[in-house]
Design a protein with these regions (language model features):
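Transmembrane beta-strands of outer-membrane beta-barrel pores
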Residues: 2-4, 19, 30-36, 52-54, ...
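Outer-envelope beta-barrel architecture signal
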Residues: 7-11, 22-26, 51-57, 78-80, ...
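Feature captures outer-membrane beta-barrel proteins of Gram-negative bacteria and organelles
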Residues: 11-19, 40-60, 77-90, 127-137, ...
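Extended hydrophobic-aromatic, low-complexity segments
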Residues: 24-28, 257-264, 284-287, 308-312
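Outer-membrane beta-barrel translocator/channel fold
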Residues: 51-121, 189-234, 318-334
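C-terminal outer-membrane beta-barrel translocator/porin domains of Gram-negative envelope proteins
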Residues: 72, 119-275, 283-285, 326, ...
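Conserved, short, structured surface segments that act as functional micro-motifs
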Residues: 315
């Protein structure tokens, strides 16, 4: 198999091991990037992941990722990483669900922040712990292709320790969906706010924003523009702040459902358009450093089925970014979700 590491392509092998009931699974990946543009200690890659009931763990060395080949979002990172986490479901009364998630991670010999691909570090060793509550109670009517009403929220606390300093962060999100009189169409208000305690010039004491977040070929969520740390119309990690408030208004338009477009081996299922506008304030607690950003844009998602079994989604998006009242840039996004 092929693996992406930073801007290079390597060769590797992946194996999955599972029990017959699917309670436990282990994934093992090994790869090598044959290029003279990387130091010798970055050409080898290894990763082991494991899951058992609510537990999950991972260990990696120079982590590589297949979808990094396509970009622009990169998951590959230099150095060692050891992670362990646990998900505990407190409420499971569908559609209501409340989860409590714990995560602990240790990094060594790193050169980039684990959660910000374009932010270099001044340290090589990092310990992080995170705990969060995640609640969802969203609903959709018969024939809908997306959630149409309800609420969801999250509250997360995180601590990062490097070079003898402990930097705490806390953030939360709140989403409210209101149906419109138009069938299968809703207005969503998506809010987020957070803050960190640390020096503004400390990379760990900042939140980073930018980009749609989708790769040209991907396996992740389709509508990543909804995530609080994305900001279509800007480069990935281009915007930062030690505290922030973000407000998005999204209008999900009625989907177009295809009844007989295609052939048995490949046919179109539906087309879902959406429009959005976002306002982001950073460093809101400091009047001298306070900045405001915004965007307007849209995304259309075309779902199609291959061989009656594989559902894929082709997404196209466009956004214009603003800093204050001035136009700051534009961004086109095209992404094919294959898994």
């Amino acid at each position: 198999m092929l693996q992406g590491y930073k801007n290079y392509i390597g060769l590797g092998y992946h194996a999955n091991i599972e029990d017959s009931l699917g309670f436990a699974r282990i994934g093992i990946t090994g790869a090598y990037t044959p290029t003279g543009n990387l130091p010798g200690n970055q050409q080898g890659h290894a990763e082991i992941t494991g899951e058992y009931l609510g537990w999950r763990a991972a260990f990696s060395y120079n982590r590589s990722d297949f979808y990094d080949i396509f970009g622009p979002t990169k998951k590959s990172r230099k150095g060692y990483a050891a992670k362990v986490g646990y998900d505990n479901t407190i409420i499971w009364d569908e559609p209501r669900q409340l989860d409590l998630k714990f995560d602990l991670a240790y990094y060594d010999k790193i050169d980039t922040l684990p959660n910000a691909q374009n932010v270099e570090t001044t340290f090589t060793r990092l310990v992080q712990g995170q705990v969060g509550l995640h609640y969802t109670d969203v609903r959709r009517s018969i024939g809908a292709v997306d959630d149409e009403k309800g609420i969801s929220w999250s509250l997360v606390a995180k601590g990062s320790q490097a070079q003898g300093q402990l930097i705490p962060q806390i953030w939360g999100t709140f989403n409210l969906g209101i149906p419109t009189p138009i069938p299968h169409s809703s207005i969503w208000l998506r809010s987020a706010a957070g803050g960190a305690n640390g020096e503004r010039n400390n990379s760990l004491a900042n939140f980073y924003f930018g980009g749609f977040g989708n790769n040209y070929v991907d396996d992740g969520p389709i509508q990543r523009y909804r995530d609080f740390n994305t900001l279509p119309g800007f480069e990935i990690d281009e915007v930062s702040g030690s505290n922030f408030f973000r407000q998005m208004v999204e209008w999900t338009l009625p989907p177009i459902v295809f009844e007989s477009v295609g052939m048995p081996s490949i046919h179109l299922t539906w087309l879902r358009p959406a429009l959005f506008a976002t306002k982001l304030w950073t460093d809101v607690a400091n009047s001298e450093r306070r900045q405001n950003y915004g965007n307007v844009g849209g995304q259309a998602d075309l779902r199609f089925s291959v061989l009656h079994w594989y559902d894929m989604t082709l997404s196209v998006g466009y956004a214009v970014g603003f800093q204050g009242t001035k136009r700051a840039g534009t961004e086109w996004m095209i992404s094919l979700k294959i898994m």
